[in-house]
């Protein structure tokens, strides 16, 4: 029996920062007391865009923690896959794992 492996072309993925949340938008009363006052994530700006090239590396200046959280969806889109819970093809909405002040991203295969 012979197996043939076909390489799938990788595509670029655009990441757009849709919304940064302030802890007061997430909780009426914070479940923990931060060491320093927290506002919206300071690493991103709403509307900011990043490009993931065909090599799949994290874009320069992107938050490592957020990248770790959204990478599975980025990889799925880059290899031509789609998420079954969205009607739109080549699109995903993903969120970083900061539970107090999350950042929501739109991922688009281009």
Language model: regions and residue ranges:
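Long, non-globular segments of proteins
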Residues: 2-10, 109-110
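Ubiquitin-like/PB1-type beta-grasp interaction modules and other compact soluble beta-rich domains
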Residues: 3-5, 53, 80, 85
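A general secondary-structure signal for short beta-strands and their flanking turns/coil
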Residues: 8-12, 100-102
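Short, basic/aromatic beta-hairpin or loop at an interaction surface
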Residues: 14-30
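A structural detector for beta-sheet-dominated domains
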Residues: 16-18, 53, 108-110
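Short, flexible N-terminal segments of the mature chain
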Residues: 28-56
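Short, Lys/Arg- and Gly-enriched loop/turn segments at beta-strand edges
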Residues: 57-68
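Short, compact, well-ordered microdomains
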Residues: 66-110
């Amino acid at each position: 029996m012979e197996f043939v492996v076909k390489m799938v072309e990788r595509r670029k993925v655009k990441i757009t920062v849709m919304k940064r949340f302030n802890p007061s938008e997430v909780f009426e009363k914070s479940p923990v007391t931060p060491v320093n006052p927290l506002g919206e994530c300071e690493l991103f700006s709403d509307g900011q865009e990043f490009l993931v090239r065909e090599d799949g590396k994290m874009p320069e200046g992107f938050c490592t923690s957020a990248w770790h959280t959204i990478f599975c969806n980025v990889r799925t889109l880059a290899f031509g896959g789609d998420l079954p819970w969205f009607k739109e093809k080549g699109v995903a909405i993903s969120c970083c794992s900061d539970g107090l002040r999350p950042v929501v991203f739109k991922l688009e295969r281009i």
